[in-house]
Amino acid sequence: MRSPTVTTKLQQIAEQAARDPDRVFWTLAHLIDEDFLREAYRHTSKSSAAGVDGVTAQQYAEHLDDNLRDLHERLRSGRYQAAPVERVWIEKEDGRQRPIGKPTFEDKIVQRAVAMLLEAIYEQDFYDGSYGFRQGRSPHDALHELRERCMMEGIGWIVDADISGYFDSLDRPHLREVLRKRVNDGGLWRLIGKWLRAGVMEKGVLSHPETGVVQGGVISPVLANIFLHHVLDAWFEREVTPRMRGRCFLIRFADDFVIGCELEADARKIMAVLPKRFARFGLTIHPTKTALVAFRKPDGHTPSDMGNGTFDFLGFTHYWTKSRQGFWVIKRRTARKRLRRTKQALWRWCRTNRHAPLKDQYHMLSLKLRGHFQYYGIRGNVRRLEVVSRYAEKAWRYWLSRRSSKSAIRWEKFQQLLETYALPIPRIVHNI
């Protein structure tokens, strides 16, 4: 629970923003006092690695009162300086590398404080079709709405779009222009500017990108969400939807979105104008990863039990198929790219950790499988869950057998091992 003082401040801001959608907030930075910073600290993740200064959350907490008092004084006097973020790379599903930035823990606290202020305002503006980086709005909520609207509104066409390198290519002058429609506080702007200009440290080399926001920062997803709200969501609701002849909708999770249309002509109009809209703000719709998918409900004369058109969204392939009762329904299964990436990750992990104590291997492998089942365990996807489960057993046995020349494990012995170290079984978690 937030402290009453901070809660009251944020509620007042939210009420003002809701009452007047055109209101511009000029004075917000002064609200970030020691109590506000303490609340931001409480809502900052303590589990991530240290930034370039090497200070962990645990070390910062050892002298929390002094640290927050000093931080507030530096913020108040303008002496606060943002540190560069440390860049690490993670593998994407297509095999490419994605850069992730690690801010210092202190910078995360200040970013969280600013994010709390911005969220109090923009949560009143965001549309129901926006799900990413919003409290209480999960990917599974987005998947549920997508399925329901496709089935109930006679949607026949899906615009499956992809933004090229959104976080890296986000145009900062345009971002400033968008934010100033609601927030024009010089103090907040100076803080945001310091984070954007702080630079990126990679292998001891400091660089200063002129575009984009660093993925991994606390403030980055908030800024990115606000920008796409203006570039895409508000534009779609105010300018696109009224011009359509049939029903249509937009569902977005962070920078991943789909548009559903009842009529093909409407979908093609959107496909034609979408790249132009994004280009106005320095963004690019990927030409080969963006497609128009025929996704209409099959009629009674369709001979197959499977409809033709499919599309991927949030790690799932969406498709029409017949239920056990013989009715056409939309189901979801783990997308092939995600399935392949999961299997590759399991294989690499079992290979890398094959010499670790068996109990430790079992514990970590179980955590990985539970995490996978927790996300992908939706109704109709049990077969893909079983594929992952069987592959985990296969990879584990293979690399346990290669710990030494004498450690080969036959299936019979491995089954006995699984009686002691039983891996989690696939289960459906989300009935959506």
What are these regions (language model features)?
Residues 1-432:
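Non-catalytic terminal/accessory segments
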